[in-house]
Amino acid sequence: MSNIYDLANELSRNLRELPEYKAVAESKKAVDADSEAKAIFTDYLAFQQELQQLAQTGQVPTQEVQDKMTSFGEKIQGNAVLSEFFNKQQQLSIYLADIERIIFDPVQDLLK
């Protein structure tokens, strides 16, 4: 029987070969090459951290935070490079969700 870690590493390598993964990687290069897109993306990642901290502490987002979410959504949709990046990322996430379901299926069986 194969070592479970070897299988996980093989899965990681195979994910990197998916056309959807490569499309996200190329799209990320385009974000990095566009100063406006990169600035918005960097700010967005920092904001995501703030949201995670709120969620971890059980705090409800204030109206100010909600307004900031809306603003980021508008900025991202208004920037073709970022919009494309997030669309490509969404396509890849379909694979990741399927893989997660498959991997955690045995754990779910234990809870039945």
UniProtKB/Swiss-Prot annotation:
Pfam families: Com_YlbF
Organism superkingdom: Bacteria
NCBIfam families: PRK13676.1-1
Family: Belongs to the UPF0342 family.
Name this protein carries in UniProt: UPF0342 protein SSA_1465
The organism's taxonomic lineage, starting at the top: Bacteria, Bacillati, Bacillota, Bacilli, Lactobacillales
